[in-house]
């Protein structure tokens, strides 16, 4: 665990143990904070790669600059981290909002990315936008929690809740207690507003590295059609869907195995 200073901010990052397969840059999702355990550093990725993960601007133990944030800044932060670590090029995995940042990274700094994994994310623009999470901020905490669970997994309908009330209550309780560290509302909103303006659709055809696209079959945040739009636009890519919603990486154990195998191929 360490903090690196760039021109704009101090970035908090962590690495898993050294592995012969080399490093992998992991860019996490909305509201991510490495103090919440377990996280990507404890995933199957770290069995094969030296995973590098970091708190994005406004979150966790990274600086929280004044003013609005932009997707370009998020991408440049990732590139600056690589600069300070002395890494010229690296495989990158972006999940959800992190997938949007990864798209912007390969657009703005194409030479830094050797392979790209994009999970449960969207391109914006004509390729479709992810669910507007900023709209949930106007809801009460209970309403926001329930709505978030439902859009995370479209199988959770009102009918399902009626038939599985105990399981529903368990889901809500788990969601309430899952994250020890939560972002403050002001900086979270900055991230959500930047996310709202995300649009890399037209640049996807310029990506000249292999891309692995992964989605959840029941994801209401980054729906199937958004992943399919990216699949049609990116020249060299593979697309797979898994049993689960936005959290399919947890729900379907096959997903991480496929990611590792693809990265090693």
What are these regions (language model features)?
Residues 52-93:
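Active-site loop/oxyanion-hole signature of alpha/beta-hydrolase fold enzymes
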